[in-house]
Regions:
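Glycine-rich phosphate-binding loop plus the immediately following alpha-helix
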Residues: 12-51
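Active-site nucleophile and cofactor-binding loops and adjacent substrate-binding regions
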Residues: 15-23, 83-86, 110-116, 133
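Flexible, glycine/charged-enriched surface loops at secondary-structure junctions
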Residues: 39-45, 95-108
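Adenine-nucleotide phosphate-binding core of ATP-dependent small-molecule kinases
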Residues: 65-94
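Glycine-rich phosphate-binding loops at beta-strand->alpha-helix junctions
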Residues: 87, 100-128
Length: 133
């Protein structure tokens, strides 16, 4: 993950992730496969969630154990899928970018990459920052 802060058309700062946040889109695809879902079905499941699981904000390496625990606890695939999307977004915002308030992102937010190629990732970000991207 990378974050470029632009002010008056000039790059003000660049923040780069630690290794734990790279490949989040690929991680979602891997977990979808582990749950026997295609990525489109994973996204559909996430969007149908009634009560997303709280899987924390740890890096994706540790999230696998949280997913297995949620399965043992009887969480639905929908709630696990939505929980994963939310966890990845929260990890990116609060651990990688180290923001304290979503307002710190500024008025205009542009995203790219595998995590945001699906509506579930975008919805998780919208919900976390309190406005549509």
């Amino acid at each position: 993950m990378k974050c470029l802060e632009v002010e008056h058309g000039l790059i003000r700062s660049v923040k780069l992730n630690e290794a734990c946040s790279s490949g989040c889109g690929a991680f979602l695809l891997t977990v979808a496969k582990q749950l026997s879902l295609t990525l489109p079905l994973f996204v559909e499941a996430s969007l149908a969630s009634k009560e997303p699981c709280d899987l924390g904000t740890r890096c994706t390496v540790f999230m696998n154990s949280k997913v297995r625990q949620a399965q043992r606890d009887g969480a639905s695939l929908e709630d696990i899928a939505a929980g994963l999307c939310r966890s990845i977004v929260r990890n990116a915002l609060y651990k990688v970018l180290r923001i304290h308030d979503p307002a710190e992102l500024g008025e205009h937010v542009v995203v790219q990459g595998g995590t945001f190629l699906n509506d579930a990732g975008l919805r998780a970000l919208d919900e976390q920052i309190g406005r549509p991207i």
